[in-house]
Amino acid sequence: MGIDDYLSKIRALTLNHKRVSTITLSETYFNRDEVYGKLMNYYDEVFLLQTCNRVEVYVYGDDDSVAEDMYKVKGTINHVDKLVGMNAVRHIFRVAAGLESAAVGESEILGQVEDAFNDARKRGALGGLLGFTIERAIRTGKEIRSRFPEISIGLASIGSLVAEYVHRVRGLNSRIAVIGAGSIGSDIVRRLAEKGFRNVIIVNRTLDKAKAAALRYGFNYAPIDSLRSVIRDSDVVIFATSATNPLLRRRDAEELSGKPIIIDVGVPRNVDPEIPGVVSIDELKNIENEIREGKRKALDEASRLIELRLIEYRRLFARRVIEGMIGELTKWGLSIGESEVKRAVKAGLIKNEEDGAALAVKSTVKKIMLPLLTYLKELAEEDKFDEALIIISGIKAKLNGDGKQS
């Protein structure tokens, strides 16, 4: 039995956004208690991951037929992808990294995998080789987030593009005025806060809306009739209202002497088109293209890193398997020592099993076995799993055959 035989016991059944609608996914959601209650009777380990984009069951066992039955009951088995061994492992690594999400690179999935992992452990459903696999997937997901933060940058939000533009041209310490607290204005305010801007004032015709948005992020707010003074005191002014008439006319802009940067993303335009130098959505599209290209490169690099971590995982997985077998050998060695101690006690050679000589026997057994156990671990790490397995199998054969201790 080689390493691939142990890996083949890792099985995944995944129903996700690539195959079905979110409505079908929601109709397939399982009761967690029922899933674990049933599957833990058939498999060594079980892991259930359910989000708005996926319903996935992972098991460690010889087949996945019992898990399949749960999807059959829901009527979605024909849309389920079945993954075995390293294909299943690769999938959960990519899921945890956000590379299999509907919005590729989104950050919520990593926390969802971690929550599901903790839930499964509390239930006693993880703790062996599958648990080790999920744990490594989470670790890799965190590494991907840390090394490639750009994969989480959104592309479609006007607010994110505005925040990125302002950050590039004026920096985080600039004084910013956001004119409008509707859907676009609110998105801009949120993105500015997420980016780290702190000196922001929100101006809106309905003061209560400006106040609510400002209080949410610790910003300032002002009524629309103070617009001109707010503009004069700002480094960047962002117009994002649905006003039908321009809020800033050319004669007003002439008084500003070009001091603030004017950004107009209002629909229709909030700024007189005759005012030169106004930044519009067209200029912001250039940033969007840059972000998209940067994100594509980051995703490619993240995928390559995952493949490297999978190579490392396979080596560590082999070591885990060997360590489990080593545990059995250790118990065998200690049992021999304990048997000899009991014989010595019975013969009156030592007082009891806690006698100094008895403890010395146990310590000696551990020391004698240590070089062998260390060697076996090293073989597993050096991708010589089969060689380590032959040695262990040979020892077991001797124990169960002519070399068995009496």
From Swiss-Prot:
Pathway involvement of the protein, from the record: Porphyrin-containing compound metabolism; protoporphyrin-IX biosynthesis; 5-aminolevulinate from L-glutamyl-tRNA(Glu): step 1/2
Pfam families reported for this sequence: GlutR_dimer (PF00745), GlutR_N (PF05201), Shikimate_DH (PF01488)
Family matches, as SUPFAM superfamilies: Glutamyl tRNA-reductase catalytic, N-terminal domain, NAD(P)-binding Rossmann-fold domains
GO BP term, pick one: protoporphyrinogen IX biosynthetic process from glutamate
Superkingdom in the source lineage: Archaea
Important for activity, annotated site positions: 91
rRNA-binding as UniProt keyword: no
Alphabetized GO MF terms: glutamyl-tRNA reductase activity; NADP binding
Keyword Oxidoreductase: yes
Keyword annotations from UniProtKB, A to Z: NADP, Oxidoreductase, Porphyrin biosynthesis
Comment, domains: Possesses an unusual extended V-shaped dimeric structure with each monomer consisting of three distinct domains arranged along a curved 'spinal' alpha-helix. The N-terminal catalytic domain specifically recognizes the glutamate moiety of the substrate. The second domain is the NADPH-binding domain, and the third C-terminal domain is responsible for dimerization.
Subunit structure: Homodimer.
Family per record: Belongs to the glutamyl-tRNA reductase family.
Record's function text: Catalyzes the NADPH-dependent reduction of glutamyl-tRNA(Glu) to glutamate 1-semialdehyde (GSA).
Miscellaneous: During catalysis, the active site Cys acts as a nucleophile attacking the alpha-carbonyl group of tRNA-bound glutamate with the formation of a thioester intermediate between enzyme and glutamate, and the concomitant release of tRNA(Glu). The thioester intermediate is finally reduced by direct hydride transfer from NADPH, to form the product GSA.
Matching PANTHER family: GLUTAMYL-TRNA REDUCTASE
Protein name from the UniProt record: Glutamyl-tRNA reductase
Species assigned in the record: Caldivirga maquilingensis (strain ATCC 700844 / DSM 13496 / JCM 10307 / IC-167)
This protein's encoding gene: hemA
